[in-house]
């Protein structure tokens, strides 16, 4: 039984490493020699995946689920990153290691592949294709950060909420033809926290959008019409 368990675990790890290899566009054979240094873990909704800098020695590949990464700077400001499956994180300090105060939490049940940050840095130095892919992913990460900040600069609360919906659809939404689907983690309280407005104001704006058939709550998930993006999406 123990041998079967180990075999199953190794097969799972191999499968996820192949998914990572596809994501960064390299042959699986490049990662295969380092399989023993990697791991697959499952997290339940609300569970902390890591808190840096105490746990900043790993890079993670999100296999399934949604996460929120809350980055705290020295002034106490909070920058939030939302991610869905098929993303590598955190990679902003991959090439210039420094302490990063970042809390990563599972918004839904999640499965992640972990590997040492030093291993990924080594692979980048040894393989130009990996370096170029990671560099492009870092740029995408910074663009996401910029879009989030731009949404928060909107003067009017309604525009801010709409732009945040657009931002969330672009980062964690699932394209369903005429609309985007956002999983059940999204709440009015979270939207109000992100927008820097009261829960009452956020709730009133979202109610207006529901009346306009631009936002629908389908059971626990959100359906956001693409018509919402026409004029104000960043």
From Swiss-Prot:
Keywords, sorted A to Z: Activator, cAMP, cAMP-binding, Cytoplasm, DNA-binding, Nucleotide-binding, Transcription, Transcription regulation
DNA-binding region(s), residue ranges: 188-207
HTH crp-type domain sequence ranges: 155-228
Predominant location: cytoplasm
InterPro entries on file: cNMP-bd_dom, cNMP-bd_dom_sf, RmlC-like_jellyroll, WH-like_DNA-bd_sf, WH_DNA-bd_sf
GO MF term (any one): DNA binding
Subcellular location: Cytoplasm
Cellular component terms per the entry's GO annotation: cytoplasm
Residues that coordinate or bind a nucleoside 3',5'-cyclic phosphate: 40-129
Function: Positively regulates the expression of the arcABDCR operon under anaerobic conditions, thus playing an essential role in arginine catabolism. May also control the expression of genes encoding proteins which are involved in anaerobic metabolism. Can bind cyclic AMP.
The protein's name in its UniProt record: HTH-type transcriptional regulator ArcR
Lineage, broadest ranks: Bacteria, Bacillati, Bacillota, Bacilli, Bacillales
This protein's encoding gene: arcR
């Amino acid at each position: 039984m123990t041998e079967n368990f180990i075999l199953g675990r190794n097969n799972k790890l191999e499968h996820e490493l192949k998914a990572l290899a596809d994501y960064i566009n390299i042959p699986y054979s490049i990662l295969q020699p380092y399989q023993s240094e990697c791991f697959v873990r499952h997290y339940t909704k609300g569970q902390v995946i890591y808190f840096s800098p105490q746990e900043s020695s790993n890079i993670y590949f999100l296999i399934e689920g949604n996460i929120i990464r809350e980055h705290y700077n020295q002034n106490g400001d909070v920058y939030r990153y939302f991610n869905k499956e098929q993303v590598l994180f955190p990679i902003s300090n991959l090439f210039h290691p420094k302490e990063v105060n970042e809390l990563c939490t599972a918004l839904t049940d999640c499965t992640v592949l972990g590997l040492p940050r030093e291993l990924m840095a080594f692979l980048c130095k040894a393989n130009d294709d990996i370096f170029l892919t990671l560099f492009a992913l870092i740029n995408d990460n910074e663009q996401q950060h910029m879009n989030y900040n731009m949404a928060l600069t909107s003067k009017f609360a309604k525009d801010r909420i709409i732009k945040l919906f657009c931002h969330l659809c672009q980062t964690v939404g699932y394209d369903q033809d005429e609309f985007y689907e956002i999983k059940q983690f999204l709440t009015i309280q979270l939207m109000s926290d992100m927008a820097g407005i009261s829960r009452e104001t956020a709730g009133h704006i979202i109610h207006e959008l529901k009346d306009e058939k631009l936002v629908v709550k389908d059971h626990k998930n959100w359906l956001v019409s693409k018509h919402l993006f026409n004029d104000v999406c960043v």
